[in-house]
Amino acid sequence: MEKFTVHTGRAVPLRYSNVDTDQIIPAVYLKRVTRTGFEDGLFAAWRTDPDFVLNKPEYKDGTILIAGPDFGTGSSREHAVWALQNYGFKAVLSSRFADIFRGNSLKGGLLTVVLPQPVIEQLWEMVEADPATEITVDLVNREVRAKDIVEPFELDDYTRWRLMEGLDDIDLTLRHVDAIAEYEKRRKPWLPVTQ
């Protein structure tokens, strides 16, 4: 997993609320067995509309998605996180996320930042007025900065540490490989091994 400390980039204003995981990536795109190649399925139904925000050239280099409230509702779908990452997004800002989506995102290295809805609206207006506006998502100091906006956000210490170290569940397990091997040596021979 890629480390996340501070990211500065352009943003994409997604003025939709209640975006569910099937809208993020429809089920027809979930047939791969790898974590890559899902960017084509991201918001696939909406991308058929030439006026959809991701089709606008001024937002093609966006790395921060500013979404409406209740982003990521619906079924638990890690592919939704992968599609956002494969497209190039490093962070998603919203006033509310579905719990399961947020958990999948943070475990997968996609920072989801909860900000007050009035701040989300300020950021939408700022980015729509000037698509070249850069936003900084600072995990070290737990704040989002853009022009005259400096907004703190909350994230528990453990999740913050994992993101800053670039550690997913497998990486955390591998940190204990010696202890696991030692445990296996002490197990009774008739018990199954855990390797």
From Swiss-Prot:
The lineage's top-level taxon is Bacteria
Function according to Swiss-Prot or TrEMBL: Catalyzes the isomerization between 2-isopropylmalate and 3-isopropylmalate, via the formation of 2-isopropylmaleate.
Quaternary structure (record)? Heterodimer of LeuC and LeuD.
Name the protein family. Answer: Belongs to the LeuD family. LeuD type 1 subfamily.
What are the GO MF terms of this UniProt record? 3-isopropylmalate dehydratase activity
Q: Quick one: which gene encodes this?
A: leuD
The record lists the catalysed reaction(s) as: (2R,3S)-3-isopropylmalate = (2S)-2-isopropylmalate
What NCBIfam families does the database record attribute to this sequence? leuD (TIGR00171), PRK01641.1 (NF002458)
Q: Which residues cross the membrane?
A: none
InterPro entries named in the record: 3-IsopropMal_deHydase_ssu (IPR004431), Aconitase/3IPM_dehydase_swvl (IPR015928), AconitaseA/IPMdHydase_ssu_swvl (IPR000573), IPMI_Swivel (IPR033940), LeuD (IPR050075)
Q: Under what name is this protein listed? A: 3-isopropylmalate dehydratase small subunit
Biological process (GO) annotations held by this record are: L-leucine biosynthetic process
Q: What GO CC annotations are associated with the protein?
A: 3-isopropylmalate dehydratase complex
- Report the source organism: Thermobifida fusca (strain YX)
